[in-house]
Amino acid sequence: MKKSSAVAVLIALFLPAACFGAGSMRDGLWEMTTTMEMPGMPMAMPPTKSSHCFSKEDVKDQKKTITTDKDCAVTEFKQSGNKMTYKMKCTGQNPGEFSGETVFKGDSYDSTMKMKAEGQVVNMKIKAKRVGNCP
């Protein structure tokens, strides 16, 4: 169970930041629904909802929006049109490797991310939409 907890902590570090920032993303309040699959887990993890308010500065530099964790570095980043792909490696207390892809569709996006940490693989799917201006 300890490994599963560490994996969950790693995931929490990168939501919502892991999937943001492409040319078509606008500032404002975004709502994300995340589903996760962990092979070998006895029960499916329920989807989680979160929201985040992104300023104009937040969405200006796509690479910087992937993570704010000082122990993580983006090792590969590509953006073409409305699609962003990346790879990231984290060290320190919660080491892991991530790869992801996000496709933006106006004021929404679909994202997939794969994380490898402590011998486990976690697949995540994120659906997000802009719900308005920041409060």
Residue spans for each PLM region:
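Bacterial N-terminal signal peptides that target proteins for export
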Residues: 1-9
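Compositionally biased, disordered extreme N-termini, encompassing classical targeting presequences
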Residues: 3, 19-22
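Bacterial N-terminal signal peptides
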Residues: 8-17
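Subset-of-secretome marker
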Residues: 22-135
